[in-house]
Amino acid sequence: MPRRRVVAKRKILPDPKFQDRLVTKFVNDLMRKGKKSIAEGVCYGAFALIEERAKEDPLKTFKKALDNVKPVLEVKSRRVGGATYQVPVEVRQDRRVALGMRWIITYSKARGEKTMQEKLAGEIMDAANNRGNAVKKREDTHKMAEANKAFAHYRW
């Protein structure tokens, strides 16, 4: 454990278009090599595609997708007397959001559409409808936690 003081979390300002902190976090996760304007273009372009295709508010669709992807439980490795157990633990709220966003971005990159905007829009719409690889990842994570429920007493 570090002995220094705990570093304060940085304040995240709402994004200019939707006035929402979650969108800012998402743009920051999407950003590569500090190119924020490109990440914003991809994100807002994907939101425009969602609005065009689904005929509904892209922000609501995004939040619904994120809620469908956020994991409640995950497993952590714990070494006990030479054996390593996968111990199910509850996920903190801020980590839930971070994992959900990360999974949406990761699995949208692996999709077959041509541009990143189309890939991202497709994955967000699939996740909002409880389909897609990001939702499957959450289900797999929950299955792992359920399968290892016997080791829950090793929690720390």
UniProtKB/Swiss-Prot annotation:
Q: Name one GO cellular component term.
A: small ribosomal subunit
Superkingdom of origin = Bacteria
Q: Does the keyword rRNA-binding apply?
A: yes
Molecular functions (GO terms) = rRNA binding; structural constituent of ribosome; tRNA binding
Q: Which GO terms describe its biological process?
A: translation
Q: Which InterPro entries match?
A: Ribosomal_uS7, Ribosomal_uS7_bac/org-type, Ribosomal_uS7_CS, Ribosomal_uS7_dom, Ribosomal_uS7_dom_sf
Keywords, sorted A to Z:
Ribonucleoprotein, Ribosomal protein, RNA-binding, rRNA-binding, tRNA-binding
UniProt entry tagged with the keyword Acetylation: no
Describe its assembly: Part of the 30S ribosomal subunit. Contacts proteins S9 and S11.
Family listed = Belongs to the universal ribosomal protein uS7 family.
Q: What does this protein do?
A: One of the primary rRNA binding proteins, it binds directly to 16S rRNA where it nucleates assembly of the head domain of the 30S subunit. Is located at the subunit interface close to the decoding center, probably blocks exit of the E-site tRNA.
Query: What is the protein named?
Result: Small ribosomal subunit protein uS7
The source organism is: Myxococcus xanthus (strain DK1622)
Encoding gene, per UniProt annotation: rpsG
